[in-house]
Amino acid sequence: MERTPKRAHGFRSTKPVKRTAEVMMEEEEEEVEVVAPGRGATRKKVSRREESPSPVRRVTRRRETVVDDEENASDEESPEAPLSDPVVYGAQRAMATVASICEALDLQWQGASVRPDDSIWTKMGGTYVRKKHPEFRLTFSSYDSFNAQVGRFLAAVIYSRAGLEPKFVPGGAHVWRHGWFPALQEPFPKCMHGVDMVTKPRTVELNPSSEAGKRALAEQNGVIEKNRFGRQVVVLRFDANAVCYKDQEHSGFPHPHAHGSCAMVFSDAAKAVSAMRHDIDWTKALYPNADKRRAEECVLISTNCNCNYASDRAISGRQFCKMTPYKLNGTDDITRDMVESRPDMKAHKKNPHTMVFTCCNPQAASGGAGRGLKKTEKTCAWRLSAMDLRYAYVFATELFTAVMGSSEPTHVPEFRWNESYAFKTEVLAPVSPIASDDPFA
């Protein structure tokens, strides 16, 4: 039972006092016990005459006294800094930034982490685009891939701000110095080695009753012929097929690409050049103040799908996203006035193709295409166009700047070829050590 301090009755008012929570807290804290490890409990009496006349100051002063004693006790217990690991400190800084962005987007972040495979990145990217850019429409991309890419670029910015140095490319993209348009020469695709691709005609046979066969007859100038077994098939001939120079003499069996190949292939080299030219001109229209030479020589490419993102291990097959030129829809509706007044419309009209990045090893179409692929190879539904890849970059940096009030580089690296990017026929699984001391038990 608490004792009433002496001379406390002299300060009581004759009016009835309303017992608020603040007053009750003062009465309970008349006697403060401070217990520290290794010390005995000490009781300190505080006279009302020694206190400030403001009850708020009295409560604040008592709280500060308790906090100071607890900090002194903790300093005696652990003389070393609790966050001596820079990785842990960086992860906590990154998590604080994630929490700030989630609160700005009215998004629940409890239980999330800053791991690259956490779903919080995709949620932040998708929520921001849906709230701030509801009018935005994708071009050949899937919403899952686009939202994930916005989250990847956002993760790259947050990792950079927190001082983290991941062993992978957090943005899942590279800046590629392509070299497709040399001066005074006819433009022609170059593979990821930086060498001119080789024209190698290819013929594909499809089942007439399959979806791929029907699409080939309707859209790709396929013809029905009899194969060497006497069966009717839809034949697609690609006379302008371009392959990596390593695949020039490769027969396609038992693997679709030769050892050391980058696995880049275009069924129509002219369409690939048109798509690359379009993406360059469109990027220059989006960034009118950018360095013209750098915008001409370099492009932003998606290199990691869901199969090999946030991993330093090789996968079976192709090691970066497959690039395919797609024909743009609606370019016939672009008028001459629009072409003369808008550089982006001029790019669409002049080169009506864009590059689309799909899974590193997409599932083969039924009917014989890619029959050298194994059914056990890892695959995903990644699909992202070059235009939407650029918009993902823009939205990610825009979101970070709007919430944090400052900009931060994404550190998108420049692509440089090395043998780790070559097509892999077999991948050795890493060893997971076993604790047992007897391998024959």
Curated annotation (Swiss-Prot):
Keywords: DNA replication, DNA-binding, Early protein, Host nucleus, Host-virus interaction, Metal-binding, Phosphoprotein, Viral DNA replication, Zinc. Residues 426-441 are annotated as: C-terminal arm, DBP binding. Residues 204-236 are annotated as: Flexible loop. One of its GO terms (molecular function) is DNA binding. One of its GO terms (cellular component) is viral capsid. Its main location: host cell. Belongs to the adenoviridae E2A DNA-binding protein family. The C-terminal arm bridges DBP molecules together, thereby creating a chain. Homomultimerizes on viral ssDNA bound to pTP. Forms a initiation complex with viral polymerase, pTP and hosts NFIA and POU2F1/OCT1. Interacts with host SRCAP. Plays a role in the elongation phase of viral strand displacement replication by unwinding the template in an ATP-independent fashion, employing its capacity to form multimers. Also enhances the rate of initiation. Released from template upon second strand synthesis. Assembles in complex with viral pTP, viral pol, host NFIA and host POU2F1/OCT1 on viral origin of replication. Covers the whole ssDNA genome during synthesis. The complementary strand synthesis induces its relese from DNA template. May inhibit cellular transcription mediated by the interaction between host SRCAP and CBP. This is DNA-binding protein. It comes from Fowl adenovirus A serotype 1 (strain CELO / Phelps) (FAdV-1).
